[in-house]
């Protein structure tokens, strides 16, 4: 599964940040991306396991992959509309 994470066009390091900072940074980064581009998010805040999937659903982005069995957590999202 790690191979899918290496395909990301953008990367966001949110290690050490706590809610709501990771999602705020994701939102800011995604705004600068083109539709269809991908973003790898690396985080260690347990709240991201809930917040990032919810953000994707709410904002019509696709959560392509996630690895949350151990820290650091990894999320790969694809920008939607």
UniProtKB/Swiss-Prot annotation:
CDD domains: SirA. The keyword Cytoplasm applies. Gene3D superfamilies: TusA-like domain. Its main location: cytoplasm. It is found in: Cytoplasm. Coiled coil: none annotated. The keyword Disulfide bond does not apply. It comes from the Bacteria. GO terms for cellular component: cytoplasm. The active site is at 19 (cysteine persulfide intermediate). One of its GO terms (biological process) is tRNA wobble position uridine thiolation. GO terms for molecular function: sulfur carrier activity. It holds the Pfam family TusA. Keywords: Cytoplasm. Sulfur carrier protein which probably makes part of a sulfur-relay system. Belongs to the sulfur carrier protein TusA family. This is Sulfur carrier protein TusA.
């Amino acid at each position: 599964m790690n191979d899918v994470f290496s395909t990301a066009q953008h990367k966001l390091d949110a290690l050490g940040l706590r809610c709501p900072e990771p999602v705020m940074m994701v939102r800011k980064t995604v705004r600068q991306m083109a539709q269809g581009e991908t973003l790898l998010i690396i985080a260690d805040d347990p709240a991201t396991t809930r917040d990032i999937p919810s953000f994707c659903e709410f904002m019509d982005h696709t959560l392509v992959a996630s690895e949350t069995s151990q820290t650091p957590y990894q999320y790969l999202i694809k920008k939607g509309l």
